[in-house]
Amino acid sequence: MLWESAVHAMQRIDPDPPVVVVNGDLLAHSISRRDAIPTAVAIAQRLDRAFPHAQFILALGNNDSGCGDYALAPDATFLRAVAAAWGPLINRRGAAPGFMRTFVRDGFYTATLPVAGLHAIVFDDVYWSPRYHAACGKGGNVVNASFTEVESALRATPGHLWVLFHIPPGVDTFSTALISKRTVIVPFMRPDLRDRFTADLSDKHIALAVAGHTHKFAYRVIDATGPNPVPMLLVPAISPIFGNKPAFLTADVTGDGSLRHVEVTSFKRGRWIDIGGMRSLGVDAFTGKALVDLQARLGANPSLRPAFERLYNAGAPSEINERNWPIYWCAATAFGTTPFRNCTQAGGFSFITQRGLEAVAGVLLIVVAIVVAVDRWQRRRRRRLGL
């Protein structure tokens, strides 16, 4: 019922959008293998009926495998079934002629968008997560192969670019703030691939990067101190399983591929309503430089933060508070563990760094030493008592 009402709300707001972007996690956590493909196909069919002229962009998420989270192997049956269902929507009017050939391999494709000179590079970056494992097939060298594929496309694709994927680079704010309580800085991607990826985007004129995964509305800025900061939009989820209100975004696209008038539509009190957008934060054009300015204003002006928190959780009570605010603010521009730690001026280590491994090893050695000492003490005590 929630899904149907969301589709109807999208149609009401824009009956004939040129582009519809779906940033992954079509499926629920722990969905059965039996239901995975029919669900992904049914979503494509429903959206096709709702928007028969729109060009679709689909990036797969960590749930989208049919055999568990972070588990999709290349050339899987799931990929072939999704390609068959979504291909007519994505390759509308020949916009993505190589889609069927490349998507069935690892979720990658490129597309021409209906703005002059604008192209999209779409890929499955779940392979780059430290949690990735091929549970329903052979992973092979998919991590390196997919990364090389994206880098080649960045070099070869002309004009203004959108890059679309599911997992954002940088820090997992929810896990860092609420699960580990700052004791561990949790990364979304393998640090080596994260650094390589963000460097690649910094070297190319990227009009927009789009990610999902967090279920919340937010932004990131790659290379915020460089001459061409890259704006990244994090899209919210229709599913409310992380305490968010169900939500989706609408935006206008300019001639250079940047966004304007990004608005959040949220399901509140039984109806879908516009709860505002980036203009409530003083941002009209969603560009790298505008986001750098917004980042500075949010850091200096605490009275602006409630507006961001409202958008972040689509109008639901926010997980962000005065104490953990630095985690969410710093994550927008500080992607590595050391820059993030310096920004928050707090402790914490990452398990995926040398320091993290050394810390874990140190804790394990201490535990082992205590266990050995207690065991020896108990043995001596038993001998003294003649047991």
State the predicted function of each range.
Residues M1-I37:
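N-terminal active-site segment of His-dependent metallophosphoesterases
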Residues Q55, I179-D274:
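Conserved beta-sheet core of the metallophosphoesterase superfamily
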Residues Y127-F147, R155-A207, A211:
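Active-site-proximal segments of metal-dependent phosphoesterases and phosphodiesterases across multiple
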Residues W3, D25, G61, F123, ...:
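Divalent metal-coordination and catalytic microenvironments
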Residues I37-S152, N228:
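Extended active-site neighborhood of metal-dependent phosphoesterases/phosphodiesterases
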Residues L27-S30, L58-D69, S129-R131, I167-F174, ...:
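Active-site environment of divalent metal-dependent phosphoester hydrolases
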Residues P15-V19, F51-F56, A116-H119, A156-W162, ...:
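Loop/turn elements at helix/coil->beta-strand transitions in domains of secreted/extracellular proteins
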Residues P15, T176-L178, G257-L387:
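Non-catalytic terminal accessory segments
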